[in-house]
């Protein structure tokens, strides 16, 4: 991998909450080392207002994100890393992506599925944010440029399985 920022794609079905949060966190915390994107297999067409609220509340930029189909990326950019953040997207047949991206599944419960009070919805989005941030922080600590693709995939998968057990 080169000195250029790594292109990272976060995928989920609706591209309205979890994948948007992942894109926003990595865009902010990656400090120019990564170019983050998000997409969905069946996008809702709008970013969930609770995702926007969560980002703003935690001091992250919340503007400029959109719910879009993964087909928008069929012709590039070439992704270095691809993360599925919902179980349904992980189970779907994903497109063949240009290049040789390393992929991993980081399953996060869907905060948009939570019904209840505003406090319960806010808590669900905060939990999803924290889970994604923890995984992204662990990824940012990896010596990505020096890892072979298979070793990198194993480490990224392990982050998805172990991050919230600590």
Located regions from the model:
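Glycine-rich nucleotide phosphate-binding loop and flanking beta-alpha elements
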Residues: 62, 89-93
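Short, hydrophobic beta-strand segments that form beta-sheet elements in well-ordered domains
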Residues: 80-87
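Alpha-helix C-terminal capping/helix-to-coil transition sites in glycosyltransferase folds
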Residues: 76-78
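Short glycine-rich anion-binding loops that position phosphate/pyrophosphate groups of nucleotides
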Residues: 16, 87-90
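Phosphate-binding/catalytic loops
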Residues: 93-166
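Residues at the C-termini of beta-strands that transition into short coil/loop
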Residues: 40, 86, 107-109
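Conserved active-site segments centered on acidic
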Residues: 2-73
């Amino acid at each position: 991998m080169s000195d250029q920022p790594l292109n990272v794609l976060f995928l989920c079905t609706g591209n309205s909450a979890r994948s948007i949060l992942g894109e926003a966190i990595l865009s902010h915390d990656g400090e120019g080392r990564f170019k983050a994107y998000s997409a969905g297999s069946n996008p809702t067409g709008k970013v969930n207002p609770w995702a926007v609220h969560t980002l703003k509340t935690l001091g992250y930029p919340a503007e400029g994100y959109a719910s879009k189909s993964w087909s928008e990326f069929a012709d590039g950019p070439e992704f270095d890393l691809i993360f599925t953040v919902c179980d349904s997207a992980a189970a779907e047949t994903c497109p063949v992506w240009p290049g040789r991206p390393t992929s991993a599944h980081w399953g996060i419960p869907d905060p948009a599925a939570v019904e209840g009070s505003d406090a319960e919805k806010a808590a669900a989005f905060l939990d999803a944010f924290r889970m994604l941030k923890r995984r992204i922080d662990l990824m940012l600590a990896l010596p990505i440029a020096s890892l072979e693709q298979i070793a990198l995939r194993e480490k990224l998968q392990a982050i998805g399985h172990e991050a919230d057990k600590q």
